[in-house]
C-alpha cells in the first residue's frame, strides 16, 4: 500500500510540472510517493533523471500553500491518487495509445499519460461521476441542426444514466452541458485553465449551475493558469481518456473537436459521430470521420449506449477464443457486474438499493437504473425494497 502524501506535495508537483508527466507516473508506479518526488525535485536529486530538465525553470515556484488557499477561495479542492473519489478505474486502462504508425505512436504516448492531480470544483467523487460517462464534443459555431441533435442525444443519454463530459466551450460543448442540466443528468466541464480563471467568461453562469446541480469543473492546471491554445489540446486528451466513449456531433474539416476524437481512437475508446448534410461545412469533419472509419455513425442515444456497453470489459482476443457460450456474468457490462457482485446469492438474504450502490461505488440513480434493467432480464429479483440475485 502506497504511503499517503501531503496535499502540499501534490500541489507543488502540479505547479512545477505542467500537464501530464510520464516521469512522475513512472516514479509512482515504482513506489515513490509524491512527498519523495517533490523533495527530489526541490533538492535537484540525481535520481529524478529526466524530471530534472523538465522542472528546471519551475522548481523554485514553491508555493503549494498559496495554491491550495487560492483554489479553496475559488471553490476548488485538489484531488490526487491518494484521495477518495480519484477516478482510478477510468484512468488505469486508458492512458496509453495504440497507433499503427510508430512515429505517431511515440509522439502520442509522450502525452498519453494519466493526470497526477486534478483540481475539482463541485462533486469531488469523480470515480462515481465518471463510472458511466460519455464525452460530447463539436464545433464552437454550431448550426441549428447541431444544436437540435446535441440536445436530443444528451437527453436520450440521460435516460441511460450517463454523465455528460465536455470542455465548456461555446457551441456544441455548451449545448451538451445545458441539455444535461435541463434533464437532470450530471455533467462535467473539463477546463483548459486553472482555478481563478473562467473561460469562456460568458459561460460563468452555466458553470455555476453545473456545480450547483452536483456536477464538477475539472482541470489539471493549478490556480492562475491561463487558457492558452496548447492547453486545449492537452485538455482534449482528458475528455477522451476519462470517459467510456466520445461523441462528435458537428465539426468542420479542421475543427479542434477532431483532436478529441483522435485521442479517443488512440486510446481504443468508442468513437461515434453524427452524420450531417453533405453540403454543410460544419459537418464535413464528422462525415469524413464516419467515411474513414474513425467513428461509428450513430443516429440516437440508444445506439450510443449500445456501442459503449458492448465495448467489452474483457480482452477482445480472449473473447474470440472462447470455446463455449459466455456465462451470465460474462454477458454483463462492467457497471452491471459491479452491481451483481454487490448482491447476495438467491436464498442468502437481500440488500437495499442504497446498500448495493454504496458497495458498488455507484450513484443511487445509476444503481437503481441497472437493477431495474437486470430485473427485466431475469438476473435479479426484488422483494419490496430489497434486492437479490435470482440464482
Predicted regions and their residues:
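Glycine-biased, small-residue-rich flexible motifs in mid-sequence functional cores and linkers
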Residues: 1-7, 15-18, 82-391
